[in-house]
Amino acid sequence: MIQQQTTDQYIKVCMKTWLLCEASVHAESTSTSPRHNLVKECSECAKACFAVVSRLVSNAGDLGDLVLNCLLHCRQCSNECEKYPGEEDIQFCGIVSSICADTLKEIAVHQLN
């Protein structure tokens, strides 16, 4: 089982990513010419992060494939965001998604042991 202090850290990182991805999805969806790949990747990342947070908050124990799924979607979101270097909000979303993916590696390694 993951220690509570560490669990809180994972929750904070995933929540921050979820919020930023949701904000990016909203901003893109309401723009005059939304970038559909960006909306898709940010939306999938947000859903995956929220699933991890929900499981961690409920103290359900086994995270199953949620961590690897989230790690994958965070990486894909980060890669998509990197395609728009002139846009600070999108770049920040990508950075936070990358940090989330790196942080979730710790849980993934812990689950393998």
Q: What positions do the PLM features span?
A:
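Amphipathic alpha-helical hairpins
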Residues: M1-N113
